[in-house]
Amino acid sequence: MTPDRLPTVFTRTEALAAGVSAGELRGPRYRKVFHNVHARSEVAHETHVRALAALVIGPDAALVARQTAAELLGGVVPPDVRVHLALPTGRLRARGIRAVRRRVTHAAVIGGVRVTTAEDTFVDLAADLSLVDLVVLGDSLVSKGRATSHSMVAAAAEGAGPVGELARRAAGLVRAGVDSPMESRLRMLLVLAGLPEPLVNHIEYDDWGRWVRRYDLSFPERRLAIEYDGRQHAESQRQWERDVDPREELDLDGWRIVVVLAKGIYREPGRTLDRVVAAMRAAGVRGSIRSTEWRLHFPGQ
């Protein structure tokens, strides 16, 4: 083997056998991923490379799991610099790798990396994530076509204890057609406050059957929509935020639209709920804030 034939990640032994000197291995053309495992410097996808490198260290039956698997599957999870592996037997201790014992019967392959399936990844992460983050993950995996809401529910059905209960509850709240994590968070804010759950991504057609508009969250029978807007105003974010509230008074083809920005979820969730409840009453949608659980997940500032 010659240096140009080395795989994406390789061991120090493989590099030396291919004619790469120890000095060259420490130079700018290569980078160390884990102890005795290296990659070419130009290889860009950090998660993919680190996952491959971890599998080089792990036993043959190891799978990439949890947060790392979720990211490779296209799911949205809080950042975690560690690579997570599932091992059917044995143990593995290496800096930057978290390995757990788990017997896996099915696997997916993403870019040459063996990972736990989307459903198994979702259930496993019930041990690490909050309810809202778990729903965000489930929505994103379904959106990527890696699973369905029904397959999530089926996978979570056998879980035991508090972790299993959390997985089942989150799976029951996963929806298809969600466009972004913030839409998931906005929907969960409403649901955890005890408000009726709006329909996800309802499409409105005109009298000729032509597509008119799609609403993030809505009560179509009452022509009420709740939209997350993450765009930056051309002049300034402050000006854009000032423009949002007046837009609630502007109905589009008879629709009342409540526009919610990031601050309405992270900084002012209580005010967002008040705005939505007021709009619901004006539109004739029955519902009120019946739970304080939302405060645990959306504390605001």
Over which residues does each language-model region extend?
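Surface segments flanking catalytic/ligand-binding clefts of nucleic-acid enzymes
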Residues: 14, 142-301
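Short gly/ser-rich loop at a beta-strand->alpha-helix junction or flexible surface loop bordering the NTP-binding
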Residues: 1-165, 199, 281-301
